């Protein structure tokens, strides 16, 4: 457990952006396409005026959502508008709606699953690195790490390998900070 905490803290502290940001998280939904460009630009300007400096897209793919070219185009346009309003942009990568279910697998199956997640994250990072007019200021791994499911050494080892590989390989796509969130429910 100590090694796990050490790796998480190290990942946070090695980033030049490890100081607190005044960010807001956006969980893109298909229904967001109903918001007009003018409304979105106004919202981004208001966020900046209210002191926010960063927009974190929690994901740019969620299961089968945001896989179509027109859905990509909408997210690209929203991201560009945020940056035009003066916000930094942290781009969330792939989110698997079944992430928490897969944590219950055997170590070998878990390792295979985490490798598939990494491949999907890398695909998203490459896609977003090539978008004209959008320059991500960082990457967000959409998986959430809790203090219950990773307690055993058998579960923690694939997780630590995955986190180290994710940070290294995503940074190879674009040398920007890589973020991940964790939550604690008193299970330490």
Name what the model sees in each region.
Residues 40-49, 53-99, 155-175:
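Aromatic-lined substrate-binding rim segments of carbohydrate-active enzymes
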Residues 22-26, 55-57, 89-93, 137, ...:
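Hydrophobic faces of well-ordered beta-strands that scaffold small-molecule active sites
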């Amino acid at each position: 457990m100590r090694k796990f905490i050490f790796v998480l803290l190290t990942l946070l502290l090695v980033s030049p952006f490890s100081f607190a940001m005044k960010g807001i998280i956006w969980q893109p939904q298909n229904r967001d396409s109903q918001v007009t460009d003018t409304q979105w630009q106004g919202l981004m300007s208001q966020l900046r005026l209210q002191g926010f400096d960063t927009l974190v897209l929690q994901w740019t793919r969620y299961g089968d959502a945001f896989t179509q070219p027109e859905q990509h185009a909408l997210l690209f346009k929203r991201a560009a508008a945020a940056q035009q309003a003066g916000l930094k942009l942290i781009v969330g990568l792939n989110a698997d709606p079944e992430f928490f279910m897969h944590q219950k697998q055997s170590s070998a199956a878990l390792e295979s699953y985490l490798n598939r997640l990494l491949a999907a994250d890398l695909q998203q990072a490459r896609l977003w690195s090539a978008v004209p007019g959008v320059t991500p200021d960082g990457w967000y791994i959409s998986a959430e790490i809790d203090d219950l499911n990773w307690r055993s050494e058998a579960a923690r080892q694939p997780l630590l390998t995955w986190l180290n590989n994710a940070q290294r390989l995503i940074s190879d796509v674009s040398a920007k900070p890589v973020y991940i969130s964790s939550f604690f429910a008193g299970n330490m």
